[in-house]
């Protein structure tokens, strides 16, 4: 993930919680939000 954009990481983590995705997905810079939405 990009350590130079902590705000983006924070938003990603918040989004991960909303879609029930693991925080590790955000840290690995995956399409957690998209996959989570499709799962739901």
Curated annotation (Swiss-Prot):
Keywords: Calcium, Calcium transport, Disulfide bond, Glycoprotein, Hormone, Ion transport, Secreted, Transport
GO CC entries: extracellular space
Record carries keyword Protein biosynthesis: no
UniProt xrefs under InterPro entries: Stanniocalcin
Residues carrying a glycan: 29
Tissue: Produced and secreted by the corpuscles of Stannius.
One GO BP annotation of this record: calcium ion transport
One example GO MF annotation: hormone activity
Subcellular location: Secreted
Keyword Transmembrane helix found: no
Cysteine-cysteine disulfides: none
Superkingdom per UniProt: Eukaryota
Function: Its primary function is the prevention of hypercalcemia. Upon release into the circulation, it lowers calcium transport by the gills, thereby reducing its rate of influx from the environment into the extracellular compartment. STC also stimulates phosphate reabsorption by renal proximal tubules. The consequence of this action is increased levels of plasma phosphate, which combines with excess calcium and promotes its disposal into bone and scales.
Family that this chain belongs to: Belongs to the stanniocalcin family.
Subunit and interaction comment: Homodimer; disulfide-linked.
Protein name in UniProt: Stanniocalcin
Phylogenetic lineage: Eukaryota, Metazoa, Chordata, Craniata, Vertebrata
Name of the gene: stc
